[in-house]
Amino acid sequence: GPPVIKALRSKTSLPFDVHLMISPVHKYIKDFANAGADIITIHPEATPNLQESIDEIRSFKKKVGISLNPDTKIDIVEDYLDKVDLILIMSVYPGFGGQKFISDVLEKIKSLKNLKDKKKLNFDIEVDGGINFSNFKSVIDAGANVLVSGTTIFKENNGDIKKNIDFLKSI
């Protein structure tokens, strides 16, 4: 939570992208922003008013992300695409690491990328969940430009983190 972000903030200049899978999310935005988060990603289902939550994040001069669960349709956030810095597409159901990638989200990524290009918008398309060596390229080819790959980075090749990151960068 915020104490961890605050403790680590002075140790690195790398951006902290926090994905708040909590409800009601508006109760926590201020704490994460003040702790040093750079990007705050929220679920539309976790706020009574998505626009107010976006405005609150912006009031702290932070970047805004909206996360879509595997079953959440893109059209729920279409009116907000020009107000965000990233859309995070979950390719597993939130809750725990190590789940299998849900391949149906590839079509959602493609649709979001097409919508982004059609409207000439500027936001990152991030994908989180089940990202591994075998699906990494297909996720990029579908239109994602930010990928979260926790389990693969820490567990493949006997946990050789550098080797795993280097391999993913080479794809």
For the regions a language model picked out, list residue spans one by one.
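Charged helix-capping and loop-helix junction motifs
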Residues: 1-6, 101-108, 163-164
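Acidic, Mg2+-coordinating phosphoryl-transfer loop and its flanking beta/alpha structural elements
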Residues: 145-149, 153-155
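An active-site metal/cofactor-coordinating segment within enzyme catalytic domains
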Residues: 1-22, 31, 92
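Structural motif
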Residues: 19, 23, 43, 67, ...
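Conserved anion-binding
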Residues: 11, 15, 27-28, 37-124
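Structural motif corresponding to alpha-helix initiation and N-cap regions
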Residues: 1-2, 22-26, 47-51, 71-74, ...
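Catalytic cores of alpha/beta
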Residues: 26-34, 72-84, 129-147
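C-terminal helical cap(s) of enzyme catalytic domains, especially alpha/beta-barrels
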Residues: 57, 140, 154-171
